[in-house]
């Protein structure tokens, strides 16, 4: 095989050996055609690559060299892990090669009593992508040796739970109850400093991540610690003698940079003041020089020797002997370059991107409230104020008076020498590419065919149904249009062409040849003569792992819709449903042609259903032609009793949910073809898995969109019924309306309108008449049936429940309720009658006395 490459195209010459095909099921070309030429042109992707989604986790592939080719391949490259020396050369640890993405905001945190400082710090740590990715993959809980409370296990558990709890509220009880395990200075239900809590929490996590027996402040501990790999850096304190220029360097690890903002109005200015050169003791001779052996004047400078992976900046908003907070605005930007402030050797860039802002509200340094703002991987900012999670604009974030800033180091320009994206294997089980050569005129350049790739997780443009990848013994599907030949062809398909799949294996060229045992299904359409030419080759028994149909399935259904560019004459949709059998003694080639006068007068839209059987069942076919004006239905001369569209669950399905067109079981018979003329295009409903009975119902969308309004009322849908048997065959014992989605949809719309009118009436009744009263029985009576009916008939809406009467004596503890056995009496209660009579007499006397008192007497 010879490969000739250029900047934009690849030409492949493949030599075929007819004797290499042992199955003998594929048609082989003549001996003269010994070489087949391929020409593949690559075009840049139109949409940005967002990475692969792997089930519930959010791992993705990050492109470290965006300047290279924009071509993205769905196939898995060789899983070669980057060399550790290459990563260390650019300042990255080998353990931090993977990152995690937060496309959606997680859960809010409940305030358990002055725990806003804890909630804000936890949210900022949760959305620190390097920390979350490491905690997601690390198996620390299995090998944890800490007796009692482990801060690293608690953070790992919290991060995993918070990422999956979208729209919920979590209570960090484990961290709040063990607050004194973080530091002895903390007390429950007391306001604490967020920066102090974060530093103590990271130190506790640092100790828990070390193996047993390793001191926490040793150089080996800083090198092994997970916390210092992410947040840790090194500061260089340099003292320079004024006389001999001798320099004394001291290196100290740090987890954050505390900057003085008393004389700085921006983050850049604060960093410049932090790394500025200053005189020791205002120029006094207090420094003992090692070379001069005397006390001399000296200068001191602090610089960053080793830049951390995650830079945490603490802005000092307090001063000694001052209770008020420094409430000045310090400007900060979304990106910062630390190169001017780093003195040590470094490779690559030192640019950081802002992802978290922690804010303190209040004028005093002893009290107040904490909240934070975090940025997700999609670039959206969210305000996390305890359990309140709100999306905000970037301008709102930069207007805050920040207390702590969180930056993450960019990895775009740090390119390892032999870097390849490492992908987990299970992510490719459902994202294999299927070879579909699109027949659009726009995609053909200089007569060459552009090979597109489509994943199983998304619908392909132009209405093509996604199929599984071209694996061993898997058919390759080709669709071509605008052929110039006007006569029908009876030649059998030659060697299986177009078996390339866009897949890279072991770093080779991104072209892979399928198994020779896989057939080709080719559909061509001549637009000039409006003739339909079809070639079909039965599919042999497929035993490959990536095959379209497995051994236990009965048949495979391929839907090959064709869509022509709108500027072509006679352009329309021609859709073909082909049933490919997989079981049988031997596959036979069958070429179906149709060249009659009826086909010449075909309208723009046509539906063809072809059943290619192997073995005992005969060959059955049926054609549904939708006339443009009169909606006439032409039926084929061959009588068809049924068309079996049976397949197992694994046929054209994947373990995870994918967008697939909804299909229904179609009874292919003359009287059942009178359907789908007035159907409207349905909206995308909830995605569901295919049932055991796979069916194909292909609807011409362009014709329906034109005639949707015209033929909505006068539909020519013929009612029909069908019943699916247990083995998947379709019987016609009873008749059931098929394709009556217009009627069902209209009835649903009418039902929704009636319900909306009732709801509006109920709302008006509640607003005008008030909430309907509820009749409560007396202490020894029951509600009569008329009263019950009357209370219910006044209004359909109700408050939902009736509260118990308020018993003040019971609430005060002076009275104890005793359950009394309920007894029902048929007649009236004589005691109640007597009490009512006395009450009426008393009321009558009372009203009479009031009336007499108001009467004026003349003196």
From Swiss-Prot:
GO molecular function, one term: cysteine-type deubiquitinase activity
Role noted for this protein: Recognizes and hydrolyzes the peptide bond at the C-terminal Gly of ubiquitin. Involved in the processing of poly-ubiquitin precursors as well as that of ubiquitinated proteins.
Highest rank taxon of the organism: Eukaryota
Keyword Nuclease carried by entry: no
Limits of the USP domain: 107-410
Name of the protein: Ubiquitin carboxyl-terminal hydrolase 23
Catalytic reactions of this protein: Thiol-dependent hydrolysis of ester, thioester, amide, peptide and isopeptide bonds formed by the C-terminal Gly of ubiquitin (a 76-residue protein attached to proteins as an intracellular targeting signal)
CDD domains recorded: Peptidase_C19E (cd02661)
Keyword Protease annotated: yes
Gene giving rise to this polypeptide: UBP23
Coiled coil: none
Keywords: Hydrolase, Protease, Thiol protease, Ubl conjugation pathway
């Amino acid at each position: 095989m010879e490969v000739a490459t250029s900047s934009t195209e690849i030409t492949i010459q493949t030599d075929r050996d007819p004797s290499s095909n042992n199955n003998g099921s594929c048609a082989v070309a003549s001996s003269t055609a010994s070489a087949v030429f391929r020409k593949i042109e690559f075009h840049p992707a139109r949409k940005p690559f967002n990475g692969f989604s792997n089930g519930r986790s959010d791992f993705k592939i990050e492109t470290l060299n965006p300047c290279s080719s924009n071509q993205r391949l769905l196939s898995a490259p060789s899983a070669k892990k980057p060399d550790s020396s290459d990563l260390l050369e650019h300042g990255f640890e080998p353990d931090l090669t993977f990152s995690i993405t937060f496309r959606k905001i997680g859960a809010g945190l409940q305030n358990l009593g002055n725990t806003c400082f804890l909630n804000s710090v936890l949210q900022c740590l949760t959305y620190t992508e390097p920390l979350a990715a490491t905690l997601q993959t690390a198996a620390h809980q299995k090998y944890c040796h800490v007796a009692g409370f482990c801060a690293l296990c608690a953070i790992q558990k919290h991060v995993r739970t918070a990422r999956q709890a979208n729209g919920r509220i979590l209570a960090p009880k484990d961290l709040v109850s063990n607050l004194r395990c973080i530091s002895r200075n903390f007390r429950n239900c007391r306001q604490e400093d967020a920066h102090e809590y974060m530093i103590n929490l990271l130190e506790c996590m640092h100790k828990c991540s070390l193996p047993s027996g390793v001191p926490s402040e040793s150089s080996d501990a800083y090198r092994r610690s997970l916390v210092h790999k992410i947040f840790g850096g090194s500061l260089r304190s340099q003292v320079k003698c004024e006389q001999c220029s001798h320099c004394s360097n001291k290196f100290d690890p740090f987890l954050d940079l505390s900057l003085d903002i008393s004389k700085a109005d921006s983050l850049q200015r604060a960093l410049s003041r932090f790394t500025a050169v200053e005189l020791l003791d205002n120029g006094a001779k207090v420094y003992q020089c090692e070379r001069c052996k005397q006390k001399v004047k000296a200068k001191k400078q602090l610089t960053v020797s080793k830049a951390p992976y995650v830079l945490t900046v603490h802005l000092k908003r307090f001063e000694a002997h001052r209770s008020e907070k420094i409430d000045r605005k310090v400007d900060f930007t979304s990106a910062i370059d630390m190169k001017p402030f780093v003195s040590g050797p470094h490779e690559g860039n030192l640019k950081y991107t802002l992802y978290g802002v922690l804010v303190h509200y209040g004028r005093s340094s002893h009290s107040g409230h904490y909240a934070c703002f975090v940025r997700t991987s999609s670039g959206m900012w969210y305000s996390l104020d305890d359990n309140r999670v709100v999306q905000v604009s970037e301008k709102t974030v930069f207007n805050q008076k920040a207390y702590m800033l969180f930056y993450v180091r960019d990895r775009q320009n740090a390119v390892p020498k032999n870097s390849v994206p490492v992908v987990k294997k299970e992510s490719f089980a459902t994202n294999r590419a299927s070879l579909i050569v699109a027949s659009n005129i726009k995609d053909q350049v200089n007569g060459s065919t552009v090979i597109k790739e489509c994943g199983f997780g998304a619908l392909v443009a132009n209405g093509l149904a996604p199929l599984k990848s071209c694996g061993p013994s898997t058919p390759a599907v080709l669709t071509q249009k605008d052929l110039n030949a006007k006569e029908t062809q009876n030649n059998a398909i030659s060697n299986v062409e177009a078996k390339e799949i866009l897949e890279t294996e072991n770093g080779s060229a991104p072209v892979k040849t399928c198994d020779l045992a896989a057939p080709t299904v080719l559909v061509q359409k001549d637009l000039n003569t409006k003739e339909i030419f079809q070639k079909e080759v039965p599919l042999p028994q497929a035993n490959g792992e990536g095959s379209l149909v497995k051994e236990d399935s009965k048949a495979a259904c391929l839907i090959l819709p064709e869509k022509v560019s709108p500027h072509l004459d006679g352009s329309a949709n021609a859709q073909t449903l082909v049933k490919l059998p997989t079981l049988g003694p031997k596959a036979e080639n069958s070429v179906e042609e149709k060249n009659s006068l009826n086909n010449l007068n075909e309208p723009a839209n046509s539906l063809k259903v072809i059943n290619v059987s192997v073995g005992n069942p005969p060959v059955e076919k049926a054609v549904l032609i939708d006339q443009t004006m009169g909606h006439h239905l032409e039926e084929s001369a061959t009588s068809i009793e049924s068309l079996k569209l049976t397949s197992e669950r694994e046929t054209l399905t994947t373990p995870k949910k994918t967008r697939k067109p909804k299909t229904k079981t179609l009874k292919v018979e003359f009287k059942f073809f009178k359907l789908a003329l007035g159907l409207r295009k349905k909206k995308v409903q909830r995605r569901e898995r295919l049932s055991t009975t796979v069916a194909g119902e292909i609807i011409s969308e362009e014709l329906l969109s034109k005639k949707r309004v015209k033929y909505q009322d006068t539909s020519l849908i013929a009612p029909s019924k069908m019943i699916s048997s247990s083995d998947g065959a379709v019987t016609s014992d009873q008749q059931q309306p098929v394709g009556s989605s217009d009627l069902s949809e209209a009835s649903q719309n009418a039902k929704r309108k009636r319900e909306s009118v009732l709801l509006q009436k109920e709302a008006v009744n509640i607003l005008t008449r008030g909430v309907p009263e509820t009749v409560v029985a007396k202490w020894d009576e029951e509600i009569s049936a008329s009263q019950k009916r009357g209370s219910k008939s006044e209004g359909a809406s109700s408050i939902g429940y009736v509260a118990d009467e308020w018993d003040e004596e019971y609430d005060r503890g002076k009275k104890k309720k005793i359950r009394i056995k309920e007894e029902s009496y048929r007649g009236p209660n004589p005691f109640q009658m007597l009490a009512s009579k006395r009450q009426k007499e008393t009321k009558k006397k009372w009203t009479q006395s009031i009336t007499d008192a108001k009467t004026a007497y003349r003196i």
